[in-house]
Amino acid sequence: MKPPPPIEELLPHRYGMLLVERVVDWDPASATVSATPSTQGWYAEAGGMPSRIGIELMAQAIAAHVSIVAWSKGEPPKKGVLLGARAYRATQPYFAAGGELIVKATRAFSDDSGMGAYDATIAHQGAQVAKARILVFEPPDFEAFIASQKQ
């Protein structure tokens, strides 16, 4: 497989909201990305990133996976939403600033309606520091879906 484009071409997130830095690896069922917490981030507390932000790191890994799969087929990525996280567990309250985190999201299931789930993990120096099942939804018509949520 050829290397994917830079993360900025895969995700719409910008400024301080783009928390992942690059795609480390990917295949049709999963993506692995890296992130490095900063003491300058909007989220910074106690010299690092609160581990609750790990859910967003996992969501960005999933978004990268969806975008890479579409990119590999020459298609634009579908827009989707994070529905929730099940059984999010972190082994520490903060991820240390400057320490590279490896975030892997593996598709557990998806269906034709756009519902899906990913099993996601975060590792630091080879040790798992967080895990969860992330529930996602890719509506067939994203704009109509968003409009329906405003009513």
Question: Predicted regions: what is each one?
Answer:
Residues 20-21, 83-85, 117, 129-131:
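Hydrophobic residues on conserved beta-strands that form the core of alpha/beta folds
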Residues 96-102, 106-151:
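HotDog/MaoC-like acyl-thioester-processing domains
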Residues 14-50:
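Catalytic strand-loop segment that frames the active site of acyl-thioester-processing enzymes
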Residues 1-7, 101-103:
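Short Pro/Gly-enriched beta-strand edge/turn motifs at strand-loop
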Residues 13-19, 96-101:
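Short coil-to-beta-strand transition motifs
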Residues 46-65, 79-82:
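Compact, glycine-rich, soluble single-domain proteins
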Residues 21-24, 91, 106-108, 135:
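Conserved positions in beta-strands of structured domains
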Residues 65-104:
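Hydrophobic beta-strand-centered segment that forms part of the acyl-chain substrate-binding groove
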